[in-house]
Structures are given as structure tokens and as C-alpha cells.
Amino acid sequence: MQKLTAVAHRGDPYHVRENTIDSLRAALDRGADAVEIDVRLTRDGVPVLLHDETLKRLWEHDRPLLALSADEVRGLTDGRVPTLAEALRATDGHRLMLDLPGTREVRVARRVVDVVRECGAQDRVYYCADATAMLAVRAADPAAEIALTWTTLAPPRPTLLDAVRPRWLNYRFGLLDRGLADRIHADGYLISVWTPDTRRSMRRLAALGVDSITTNRVDVLCALRAQANGSGTETYGAETRDA
């Protein structure tokens, strides 16, 4: 059976607040092969871990991140929104998948790439987001490992693929079927999917031969993978439970 990579979505968000150091460590303790994190810039250009444009949902401050300095973010969150550099140090030796939801310019991507380089983490970091963001990453780092996020059944244009040069195609999990999975592999790309959280969905995707699953329940995925490896099958068990 092929190695299925278990990626923890924003850490271990069902147990620990997402995109925090504690959440990243919890995910690794639960068996994650890699942790997906969201990276945005503060007003003064410091990459920090935050999915949303504001602090409202997680930190109860309705303040746009781009209006705040890194020091102000630290003060408003008691230091619990880590910088990218802090996250890289805390996960030393482990893979990180950097999602860049707010990246629209090469200068933004370059700042993120620069921090990764300064931390000596190029070999364990890869990047995901939409085409605009990944074109910016490719311009900032010709050697970057990229997972191009794709959300429609219409395939990426060949000219886009030539420009981005992704290693992975990163699909919303509900789009994947056998035909699409076979086509992606035939074209020479690895398949990453996000974010199935039920056992049934995880089993279905594993049976399709995806190479990586990003989930909020990485402990469940790792348990299913261990069970399948122990049985020597590629079915990941019956598909009757949806818990």
C-alpha cells in the first residue's frame, strides 16, 4: 500500500485552538506527518499564523491583521498568535504546509519565503493556496515545493501548470473520484485533498489512491492508516461508519 501522508489542518483544532504552537505540537503528538498552517503578514511585514483577515473569530478583537503590528498582535492575544519563525522553531524536524490565503503579490510571498530560508527550513516546508498565490511563491522561490489548490472539476490550464510547476494538486475532497484521481496521477502529480473529517470520507479517498489527506481529525486518520497497514489491505476497512 502506498504511503498516505497525514496532514493536520491548522494543528489539532478539535482539541486546541487552531494555528497556535500548542495546536501544532498536539497534532504532531497525535501522529501527523505534517501540519498545515495559515500565514499572513502584519502591518509591519511579519508573517504570523492566522487564517482570517481579522482577530475576531479566534481572539475576539475585531481588528484587521493588516492594521496591526506584530507587537500589537502579541499584546492583543497574550502572545498566542505565533510568528512563522516561532512556528518553524517549534516544529523543528517536521514538515509544514504553508497556506497563504491572503497572498496576492510577490513581495508578500517573498517575505514568507525569506523567513523560511532564514530558519533553514526550505527542505521541510511546502506551500499551498490558489493560483495567484502560488504564482507569487514560484516567482519568489524557483525551488519551492508547491501544492496548487484547486476547487473546480475544470482542470488547471497547461500554461498555468507550466508557470507554477506544482508537485501536488490540492483538491477539495468532495471533487475527487476515480477518474479524476487516475488522470492527475497519469499527468505526473501527487494528489492532496482537504478537509475530510469523517472515517467514511477518509476511507473513500484512501481507496482512490490519494497521496495526502489534510484533516481536522488527524488522530482518526492516523488510526485508520495504522489499522490498514496492520491488516495488509488497501481498503481502510468497511465504509459503513460515518463518525
Language-model features: where?
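Phosphate-group recognition and catalysis centered on beta-loop-alpha active-site segments
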Residues: 1-243
